[in-house]
Amino acid sequence: MASRQELQSKLEELLESEHVYYDPPESIKLEYPAIVYSKSKIATKRADDTAYLFRTSYELTVISRRPDPPVVMKLLALPYSSYDRAYESDNLHHEVLTLYY
């Protein structure tokens, strides 16, 4: 299982920016384009009453001033990623994805 810090580095690499935020407090002023992400669940595989595989699911929100930011397609190229929805709020485009990492 990869660490959250490894995920942070991978997201920064794909975004080509350090504007990647894990569960940011409301006091943080985000810079765009940005990726905001948080842990959503941990899937567990069991056999013989023993947990043997854990996979963490993260909800990622790509926030951009323009529609269709290229990083979305880069994220979808990662294994175990899926596109959930898109919406606009405060003149910013939001693309929401799920990633198991």
Residues of each region from the PLM?
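Short, conserved charged micro-motifs
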Residues: 67-74
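Acidic-leaning, charged glycine-interspersed low-complexity segments
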Residues: 74-101
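Oligomerization/assembly interface segments of phage tail-like spikes and tubes
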Residues: 54-65, 93-101
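Small/polar-rich, solvent-exposed N-terminal microdomains that initiate assembly or binding
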Residues: 1-44, 50
